[in-house]
Every structure is written in C-alpha cells, then in structure tokens.
Amino acid sequence: MKIKIFVLIAFSLSLSNLLFAQELTAKKMSEQAVLKENPEDAVKYIQSVIGNISVLAEKKAAYAFLGTLQEAMALYADAQKSYSIAAGITAGNAEGMPKKSSERLVIDAVRCALSAGDYENAKNWLNSAVRNSKSEEIQATVKLYDQWCALSSAESYEQTIEPVAMLKAYLEVPSMQIQKPAVLLTLWYITGEKTYSQMLENEYPLSPEAAIATGKAQIYPAPFWYFVPRKIE
C-alpha cells in the first residue's frame, strides 16, 4: 500500500510540473518579468524560463518580447538574435501579447543588426522573403534599410553619395511617405544640410526625428549613428 501511495504522489508531482510547464505563456512570462527590480534581472528571468514554453505561438511572442526588452537596453546584438529566433517560428499570435508578423520581426532584426553595426547580417535578412512582402509599410522599410546598409558599409563620405541620392529620390516617392521622417533625419545627419531639419520641423513637428534634428532630443547611442561617415562643417 505504501508503495502505491508513493507512486501516486510521484505521479501527481510529475503531472503538476508538466502542467506548470505547459501553462507558462508569453503573457505570464512578461508579467513576471516586469516585476523584477531592473531590466537586467528581467532578461535573466526570461532566459531562464523561455525554454519551458512549448506552444509555438507563445514561444514566438516570448522571443519577440525578449528582443524588445534587449533593444530598449541597447543590447542590439542580443536583440537581433531574439528577433531572428522569433521570426523563424511559424506560428500565429499569442493571446494577450502584441501582434507581430514574421515579416515585422525580420525588420526588427535588421534594425538591431544595423544598430549594432552588423550590416552584413542586416543585408542577409533584407535579402530574405521579406523583400517580396505585400505590405507597403514593410516594402518602404526595406528600401530605407537598404540605404542604411549602404551607409553602414561606407568607409568615406564620398561613398555615401549614392545612398544619399537614393534617399533624396525617396522623398518624392508616394509609397515612401510612411518613412519620410526617417529619410529626412538620415539626410540631415549625413549631409548636415539644414533644409532637412527644417522640413522635419515644418511637416512632422511632433515626431522624434524632428526633436533630434532640432536639438530637443539626442540620437540613441548606437554604432550605426556613430561610425557612418558624415559631412561635418
């Protein structure tokens, strides 16, 4: 009888542990993460439990959340890896979490790769299926990031002439209007021409790009912005 009771208890504990692992969702994980004392502890917590998530949609959302947190902490290389893992998981959206398509996650990975100064990885992701996206927003972002890749690989200001010319042309392309603030900010930063900062202030006065160009905010520290060649008077 004692043996039977022991077996039943052991089975119950095993079943309880299994159910706990199955019940861990991206939403529950994120809720626990934000209760940590600091972002570093939140990241460590997520990394310690993310392997317990078995449902693909939940795992995808969990890695996307981890990438978002790492990007906010300027851990761009780590964020790029997290976004990449999420993008590679074929699944729908998790309940209670931000909805992100695989295409959007690829774009997130590209942005972080560029922020980390890893333009080779960024180019590889841009040359994936995302280039054939049916989303106008994604297509516009791909075109913008293509030029950012070119700027990242430039070793002199002269090598920025071609991507700058492309960015100037994009200002007149209707499908690129969604990225116009970013295009204007890039042109202002690279060329130093006040025309672009004035356009930002006039057309997008409340945008983060306008705040940066007018000195009300600073560009977030990232290798892309620090090492890309630019014209300095």
Regions found by a protein language model. Name each.
Residues 26-29, 63, 106, 143, ...:
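TPR repeat positional signature
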Residues 186-233:
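Terminal, low-structured helical/coil segments at or just beyond the last alpha-helical repeat
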Residues 29-32, 66, 109, 146, ...:
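Structural register within alpha-helical repeat arrays
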Residues 48-59, 88-99, 131-139, 171-177:
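Flexible helix-coil transition and linker loops at the boundaries of alpha-helical arrays
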Residues 19-61, 209, 213, 225-233:
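N-terminal leader/linker segments that initiate helical-solenoid repeat arrays
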Residues 33-36, 70, 113, 150, ...:
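Residue at a conserved register position within TPR or TPR-like alpha-solenoid repeats
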